[in-house]
A protein has these predicted regions:
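Short solvent-exposed capping/turn motifs at the termini of beta-strands
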Residues: 49-53
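Extended, hydrophilic extramembrane loops/domains of integral membrane proteins
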Residues: 185-215
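Hydrophobic h-region of N-terminal signal peptides that target proteins for export
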Residues: 8-18
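Juxtamembrane interface at the cytosolic side of transmembrane helices
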Residues: 241-255
Length: 255
């Protein structure tokens, strides 16, 4: 009884000091393993909203909204624009980005534009049109915009970038959950799942959980071999190709 009373006494100041809403998020999978037969996965993001004393509960006039953003590791990428010359498609202009998320998916309880203004969207990178990409050249703004749209559209076609408005369900203004699809072509690396609590056009709280996407089985062995000993990996690949070619030729001669 004394220990319980002491715990309550220690927790009381923390509870009284809570001046802002707090998010307690989690994800259904902290690790996603990619094997040869991997066809994609469904990720469940869920959690609770802890309102401080005196904070009104969600209602029709002052709703509480939740936005979840899943990001893959950043990478450098070069986007090339093709041009048709004399009936042949050739590479024309190009623009290199030093940093672009390899995967970006955003789910929200309502459309993002209904929740916050343009400035807030840009600060927190809420939405595909608010991604802060980093072109390495000093190309004119209209050229940068054209290439950025091309990059986003390319990754949308591969299901690596997408938006899912109304995909976050909030229950009684306290619990929330969202299901997000991870495509088969997802890159490996350290992912983050960021959750934002929004009310009256302001971000009141945020929390992050990490997700590890990695190869497993034979694919993991091959990837590690390529990273740790690229020279031996190259020799092995060449030797294997020669052996398979010789074997195919021998079988063809017998037939």
């Amino acid at each position: 009884m004394k220990r319980a009373g002491l715990a309550l006494a220690l927790a009381a100041p923390l509870m009284m000091a809570q001046a802002k809403p707090v998010l307690v998020p989690d994800v259904s999978q902290r690790e996603i393993e990619i094997a040869y037969s991997f066809t994609g996965a469904e990720l469940l993001l869920f959690g609770a909203i802890l309102l401080p004393p005196g904070e009104p509960r969600a209602d029709a006039h002052h709703p509480i909204d939740v936005v979840v953003v899943v990001k893959g590791p950043s990478e450098s990428i070069t986007i090339r624009e093709k041009e048709k010359v004399a009936g042949i498609w050739i590479n024309a202009d190009r623009l290199r980005y030093s940093s672009a998320p390899s995967f970006y998916a955003i789910a929200s309880s309502r459309p993002i534009r209904d929740l916050v203004d343009d400035r807030t969207r840009a600060i927190y990178e809420l939405g595909l049109d608010s991604l802060q990409l980093s072109p390495t050249s000093s190309a004119p703004p209209d050229v940068q915009d054209r290439f950025t749209r091309g990059l986003v559209e390319l990754r949308q076609r591969n299901n690596l970038y997408y938006e899912a408005p109304h995909a976050v369900e909030i229950t009684d203004g306290v619990l929330y959950r969202a299901r997000m699809n991870i495509p088969a072509r997802v890159p490996v690396g350290k992912f983050t799942a960021e959750t934002f609590l929004i009310r009256d056009g302001k971000v009141l709280g945020a929390a992050v959980r990490d997700i590890d996407v990695r190869k497993s089985g034979f694919e993991r062995f091959v990837a590690r071999a390529a990273e740790r000993s690229s020279f031996l990996y190259g020799l092995t690949a060449v030797a294997l190709s020669v052996f398979l070619g010789w074997g195919a030729g021998a079988i063809a001669r017998r037939v």
